[in-house]
């Protein structure tokens, strides 16, 4: 990281590395979870950088208001970096986040719209675009520009994800010659599906993203899809070298597969909370096979088809009744959006239906725990015999990677061919079409009936494959490209 010594790293994301909330009448701080924070925050801390993010809670805004320009130095007792909060009125934020970012963009990028009926891109959507998405992206850009102007070091701007597609264009227009990069953590759709968006929105998004010098995706397929969308709008392509030409400017389109932090996973497995949850999982499993899945209650995760596949497995293989337990954990997400509330209810209804149909006084086929509990997830990772990860589409999905490193039962993974990680892991998983319930039911039987030596071969191969790339490879490969292109 020597090249960072004269740089001012500025990370830009909708959700930041910390969140403030009220507990027992006092405002307290919670560090954000996930690989993005654990990987990039040490960089920001080491080089006294800045993280620009939305004020997600009233307490975020309250704390930010106590500092000039809403720039909060952290940690409070020994500041090593700054969180620079973007504060937007609630109505505009909801238009930006809960109308345009999700569901409109999220559903397009995960192929989830029921196109004979939805989306209906009417005057309300256009208003949410103009007054919400465009407005908030301008606010983020203004904040980043302020950070660039206040620091004499060369700025290194790293924007994150689909909430901020327009932001780099606004920055470039004001600042001019500045190095911008952006990583998109979700899939990029094929060009025909991207055309669901009106041309005005498509052009604005592509123009914004092409203001970056480096644009990152998880896998090569998403890079190709993006470049084809650029070609549709008349941009010149150097497909062999992964470059989109925009006049005199070049955008280098690269794939950087994200991974996991093995050290963090090992630490989790040593905690008292983990041991307590492992006792629960082992009692739940008893001498049965344990099938496991964990998801946010997001429509893209394809939870209901996973349960329907299990239902078909039980129908076709009654010899497994009473000998298998399906544990599913997950947390509610985006419940302010009607489609998500309806889906959460449908998931619970499906579980109740299957348990009523096949269960009895001594056996409950599915145990569904609808809350966030990482120690419980980790305990299930360690003890599953079969893991199901069957998203309709997913940028990467690190669940199979985390689970493989923790599992001690030579567990087998059933993995959707539409998960980004399938490109890396295909050799050591049972791949399925996420829409094919029959194929997934057969995969469950194959996983549970598999001979122990084959289970071990797949499990050991998967562990080895995951260890080849940690989350630090993801960030270091980006820095290597930045260093080369900034010279």
Language-model features and meaning:
Residues 1-487:
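Catalytic cores of carbohydrate-active enzymes across secretory and cytosolic contexts
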């Amino acid at each position: 990281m020597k090249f960072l010594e004269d740089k001012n790293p500025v990370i830009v994301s909708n959700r930041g590395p910390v969140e403030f909330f009220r507990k027992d009448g006092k405002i307290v701080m919670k560090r954000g979870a996930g690989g993005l924070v654990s990987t990039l925050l040490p960089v920001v801390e080491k080089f006294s950088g800045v993280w620009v993010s939305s004020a997600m809670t009233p307490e975020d805004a309250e704390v930010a208001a106590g500092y000039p320009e809403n720039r909060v130095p952290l940690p409070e007792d020994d500041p090593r970096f700054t969180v620079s909060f973007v504060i937007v009125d609630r109505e505009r934020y909801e238009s930006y986040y809960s109308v345009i970012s999700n569901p409109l963009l999220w559903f397009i990028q995960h192929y989830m719209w029921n196109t004979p009926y939805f989306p209906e891109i009417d005057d309300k959507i256009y208003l949410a675009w103009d007054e919400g998405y465009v407005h908030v992206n301008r606010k983020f850009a203004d904040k980043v520009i302020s950070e660039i102007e206040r620091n004499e070091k060369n700025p290194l701007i790293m924007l994150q994800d689909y909430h901020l597609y327009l932001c780099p264009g606004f920055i470039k227009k004001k600042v001019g010659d500045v190095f911008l990069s952006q990583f998109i953590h979700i899939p990029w759709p094929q060009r025909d599906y991207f055309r669901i968006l009106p041309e005005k929105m498509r052009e604005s998004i592509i123009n914004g993203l092409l203001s970056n010098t480096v644009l990152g995706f998880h896998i090569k397929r998403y890079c190709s899809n993006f470049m084809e969308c650029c070609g549709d709008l008349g941009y010149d392509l150097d497909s062999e070298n992964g470059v989109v030409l925009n006049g005199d400017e070049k955008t280098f389109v690269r794939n950087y597969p994200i991974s996991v932090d093995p050290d963090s996973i090992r630490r989790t497995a040593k905690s008292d909370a983990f041991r307590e949850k492992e006792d629960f999982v082992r009692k739940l499993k008893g001498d049965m096979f344990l099938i496991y899945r964990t998801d946010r209650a997001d429509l893209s995760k394809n939870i209901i088809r996973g349960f329907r596949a299990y239902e078909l497995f039980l129908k076709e293989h009654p010899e497994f009744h009473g000998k298998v337990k399906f544990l599913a954990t997950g947390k509610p997400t985006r419940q302010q959006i009607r489609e998500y509330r309806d889906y959460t209810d449908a998931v619970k209804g499906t579980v109740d239906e299957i348990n009523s149909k096949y269960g009895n006084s001594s056996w409950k086929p599915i145990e569904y725990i609808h809350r966030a509990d990482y120690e419980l997830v980790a305990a299930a990772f360690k003890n599953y015999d079969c893991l199901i990860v069957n998203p309709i589409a997913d940028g990467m999905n690190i669940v199979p990677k985390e689970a493989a490193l923790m599992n001690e039962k030579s567990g087998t993974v059933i993995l959707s061919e539409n998960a980004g990680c399938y490109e890396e892991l295909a050799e050591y998983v049972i791949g399925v079409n996420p829409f094919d319930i029959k194929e997934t039911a057969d995969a469950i039987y194959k996983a549970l009936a598999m001979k122990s030596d084959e289970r071990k071969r797949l499990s050991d191969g998967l562990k080895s494959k995951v260890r080849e790339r940690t989350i630090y490879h993801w960030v270091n490969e980006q820095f290597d490209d930045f260093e080369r292109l900034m010279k």
